[in-house]
């Protein structure tokens, strides 16, 4: 019997504001002593009243627009009631009945090249919980994270397999990263994902019983958990069993999901309107201001790079994959006035260094203006491409004007015809066999003589002039 998988993803994304969502406590919870970035509001003390951080609302709107959502001009906060040590109030302020954003869509392309669209059901503003640190004998709680602003992005159950889930998460992460509203790092905990998985017989329209899997600390873990849970549920059904609606925990070490608790229904949380916060009213002016701040996203940028800079699809996709890398590239283009050479340098030399040093483009020490100037020196025949690579290596430790480096190191390209002639004559005199080989029709001999000439000039001779001079002498 054939089955199909139905997947919905719930993504929690921390917003990168300076202060928490309901109070003025510092939101940079990891760089503080435990339980020091707290106040009566974020620890739920009696009588303490929350107030919405306006920056949270702007960031939330920006994220929703990036994901193609409709913005509700009026929305409300609600209380989700439950008891757990990481929630000091014994409830979470969220948006259940009327979220601020709904009905989004994300276009994705899988690694195998398949295109699809995944609907986003809703996005809601809520607060994070305290951070639990589990040891062998106890659980420690750091309330610095309590009330750090979150948005929860809930997809529609339209993802068909683990490959699509991976593409959805990567696309979502890339678009949110471009808005700069979040670090979107699963490693740092600013992006977290729960996977809802169910299976049904192929052709059926009714959804199967779903499970929710937590503790997914990477996109690869999400993929593995979905694949495991799909196979587990199919096996249960094939053996005549019944899938239990429950929350399961991903065990990374053993690559399995394990039961955690029975899955709660909405009624279990006794949602009711938050009495201490007014409705969110999003004005036309506010929405317009946020729209004006929206960036050009990676897919849009890639298309422009292809049209404007005549790059191929792979080059454009790589250069636009990160906003900072795209900005670096365009600054090199601006200074060098050569999009082709700029792309070559960024895609080869610069990405090589980033990979070797395991750093981001923001941490790269060489300013884009200096790469642009280096390219201009090549175009002006001041230095050869080979010497340019030597200058680049110097730039990695001495980030200064490449023109100064070239002058200080005596690296200016030899373009004087008489000097070129002397170099070529010496090489021909020292390599009579190669001269005979060339005259006998062996084309590789010319490459050898070129190489010897460049070596004699220590890479400083103009390659084109060397080549022309060798040919002239051999045919003369």
Regions found by a protein language model. Name each.
Residues 16, 231, 326, 330, ...:
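Amphipathic alpha-helical core segments of compact helical bundles
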Residues 143-148, 186-193, 202-205, 412-476:
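C-terminal non-catalytic interaction appendages of large macromolecular assemblies
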Residues 280-281, 316, 328-330, 341-342, ...:
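Extended hydrophobic-aromatic, low-complexity segments
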Residues 287-293, 330-335, 341, 371-383:
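Extended, non-catalytic structural segments that build the interaction scaffolds
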Residues 299-306:
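Extended, structured, electrostatic nucleic-acid-contact surfaces
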Residues 361-372, 376, 382-455:
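Strongly charged, low-complexity linkers/loops
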């Amino acid at each position: 019997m054939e089955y199909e998988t139905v997947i919905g993803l719930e993504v929690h994304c921390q917003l990168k504001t300076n202060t928490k969502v309901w109070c003025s406590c510092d939101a940079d919870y990891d760089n503080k002593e435990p339980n020091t970035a707290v106040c009566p509001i974020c620890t739920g003390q009696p009588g303490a009243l929350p107030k919405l951080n306006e920056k949270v609302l702007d960031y939330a709107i920006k994220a929703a627009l990036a994901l193609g959502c409709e913005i509700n001009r009026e929305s409300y906060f609600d209380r989700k009631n439950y008891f757990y040590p990481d929630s000091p109030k014994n409830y979470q302020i969220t948006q259940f009945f009327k979220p601020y954003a709904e009905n989004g869509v994300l276009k994705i392309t899988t690694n195998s090249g398949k295109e699809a669209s995944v609907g986003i059901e809703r996005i809601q503003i809520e607060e994070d919980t305290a951070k639990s640190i589990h040891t062998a004998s106890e659980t420690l709680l750091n309330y610095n994270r309590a009330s750090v602003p979150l948005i929860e992005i809930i997809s529609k159950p339209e993802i068909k397999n683990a490959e699509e889930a991976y593409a959805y998460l990567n696309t979502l992460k890339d678009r949110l990263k471009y808005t700069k509203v979040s670090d979107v790092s699963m490693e740092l905990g600013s992006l977290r994902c729960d996977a809802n998985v169910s299976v049904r017989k192929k052709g059926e329209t009714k959804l199967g019983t779903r499970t929710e899997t937590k503790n997914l600390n990477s996109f690869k873990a999400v993929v593995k958990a979905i694949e495991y849970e799909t196979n587990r549920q199919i096996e249960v059904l094939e053996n005549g069993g019944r899938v239990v609606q429950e929350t399961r925990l991903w065990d990374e070490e053993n690559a399995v999901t394990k039961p955690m608790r029975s899955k709660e229904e909405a009624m279990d949380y006794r949602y009711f309107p938050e009495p201490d916060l007014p409705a969110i009213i999003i004005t036309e002016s506010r929405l317009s201001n946020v729209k004006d701040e929206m960036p050009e996203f990676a897919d849009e940028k890639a298309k422009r790079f292809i049209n404007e800079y005549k790059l191929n699809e792979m080059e454009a996709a790589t250069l636009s994959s990160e906003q900072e890398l795209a900005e670096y590239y365009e600054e090199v283009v601006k200074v060098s006035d050569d999009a082709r050479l700029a792309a070559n340098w960024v895609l080869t030399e610069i990405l090589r260094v980033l990979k070797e040093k395991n750093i981001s483009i923001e941490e790269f020490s060489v300013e884009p203006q200096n790469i642009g100037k280096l390219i201009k020196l090549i175009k002006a025949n001041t230095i050869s491409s080979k010497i340019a690579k030597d200058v680049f290596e110097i730039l990695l430790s001495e980030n200064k004007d490449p023109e100064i480096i070239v002058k200080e190191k005596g690296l200016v390209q030899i373009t004087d015809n008489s000097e070129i002639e002397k170099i070529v004559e010496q090489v021909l005199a020292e390599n009579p066999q190669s001269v005979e080989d060339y005259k006998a029709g062996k084309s590789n001999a010319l490459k050898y003589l070129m190489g010897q000439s460049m070596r004699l000039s220590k890479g400083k001779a103009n390659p084109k002039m060397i080549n022309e001079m060798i040919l002239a002498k051999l045919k003369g």
